[in-house]
Amino acid sequence: MRLVLLGPPGSGKGTQATRLKEKLGIAHISTGDMLRAEIAAGSELGKQAKAVMDAGNLVSDDILLGMLESRLTQADVAKGFILDGYPRNVAQANAMDGLLAKIGQPLDAVVQLDVATELLVDRIAGRAKEQGRADDSPEAVRQRLQVYNDQTAPVVDFYAARGTLARVDGVGELDEIEARILAAIKG
């Protein structure tokens, strides 16, 4: 099973990806983990990413795609993977689909976790309180959601047009949401 989890900040992508990894016995790939691993390994891509990040810039699509290609050659992805937080824009989605076609591992499903904006703000504010994070003010959260809507929401349309998208209600108990995702990807 090769799966992409999409959804705005606070929708529960990371939580559900961790649960699905255990349930399905497949690798969980997050861009943050990939970046940290490449930088720690001192690879050429890691050095490039570190230089970009140290300058306060976003890592380019080309560097991220190179890291993804490297990650997909590792043994733990042989049974499949869950991508969480990637692709973030249509250019990344196009490039990733090309890469997956080249290596003969097309996506099986793309799941969009749908959660109302006000609930997302409440969830993230609650998480910020628990973790003592000041950068998750309601205003900052709304800004992150706006960036998501501008850049990442078009990826949902991209996969809907290809017939690989399943929309799942991301509200409820964790077990209920997991069951909805499993039903959507097996249906």
Curated annotation (Swiss-Prot):
UniProt keyword RNA-binding present: no
MF annotations from Gene Ontology: adenylate kinase activity; ATP binding
HAMAP family reported in the protein's UniProt record: Adenylate_kinase_Adk (MF_00235)
Keyword Magnesium: no
Protein name: Adenylate kinase
Organism (species): Stenotrophomonas maltophilia (strain R551-3)
Role this protein plays: Catalyzes the reversible transfer of the terminal phosphate group between ATP and AMP. Plays an important role in cellular energy homeostasis and in adenine nucleotide metabolism.
InterPro entries reported in the protein's UniProt record: Adenyl_kin_sub, Adenylat/UMP-CMP_kin, Adenylat_kinase_CS, P-loop_NTPase
Reaction it catalyzes: AMP + ATP = 2 ADP
Principal place of residence: cytoplasm
Gene name of this polypeptide: adk
Region annotation LID: where it falls in the sequence: 126-136
Superkingdom of the organism of origin: Bacteria
